[in-house]
Amino acid sequence: MEWINEKAKTLKQGAIRAMFDRANTMTGVISLGIGEPDMSTPKLVCEAAKEALDKGITHYTPNAGTLSFRQAIAEKSYLKDLHYDPNTEIIITNGGMGALSLLFLILLNKGDEILIQDPQWLNYVAQVAYCDGTAVRVPTDLEHNFEMQPETIEKLITPHTKALMINTPNNPTGSVMTRETMAKIAELAVKHDLLVISDDVYNTLLYAGEEAPCIAAFPGMKERTVIVNSFSKSYAMTGWRIGFVAAPAEIVDRMTKCQENFNACANAPGQYAATVALDHPELCEELRQTFERRRSILLDGLARIDGIRCNRPNGAFYVFADISSFGLSSVEFCNRLLDEQKVVCIPGSAFGECGEGFIRIAYTCSDDNLYEALNRISCFCKKLMK
């Protein structure tokens, strides 16, 4: 008897996890690979969770999450001007990944196509495939700041295209979609009757005066937009698994029924703590300022290394650096950098074909480790240039 089904056999370990597994066998490694804040969750949020435990808030919540939390998201988050109904248009999920998995489960029929940027965080592609959908790559490049071009998107739309995914600020590139580009994409979505899935998880991490407009705010878009977000990056709460979706009531209703049958609800103390966190936007700002400082350290350091080329990304906590001049594949470059200098970066090919020739560098470590990692990368690149 074969116990494992054919779909499960298609799931593979990602290149990111493979790099960490190799690094874990070594000592003295500096990781510029991890896609999460290195700091702990703010004490105020942790104290709120303890308060929830002391109050006995340890039971199931409604499948859609506590109403008080949904109300706080509707009234206190960046969505407040869009007037989402907390009763019918917001659901609390097990992180942003839990939100996406529920969404794809209720959205996709076999053969439905979703347009996804390349390079892009590849869990999107795996989840779409597992739900019988087809991920169609939208190529981007450094010259256009890794921003999807509306004319490229339109050429890829077919009768099977159901949705378009956007992620701004972006993982892995750190790029932020301009308001002008977003407006054109919104027009395309209306013209072709597409759903837009907007992964906003990095939208508090913006630098150099950058703004991150919400596509649901454009004409005709609220009724065709699914906003996915979480508290993981903005409040350093990756391990808490607290996310949410704001979307048309029909979609939220189906996601809620799906959540009831698959995992009941998000954890109750985490929902309580995240509700408190929304009263303290200064916590997000403290994280943002830290990452903006580190961004400057990293970009200034990379600018002094011959052979490396990159843009100045204004969001998230990544730099997507061009290492093609060294004549190595991105996997070869990262493996040798780890072996010879004990620095973890992620090969760009892990994020799609358009990522080949690049490496993702996350500035999610201390300033001191960042300076040391830059010294090691510089030594490594000088050796390659000889």
Language model regions located:
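PLP-dependent class I/II
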Residues: E2-E6, T10-L11, F20-M26, I30, ...
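A short acidic, glycine-rich active-site loop
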Residues: G56-Y60
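Short beta-strand to alpha-helix junction loop
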Residues: A64-G65
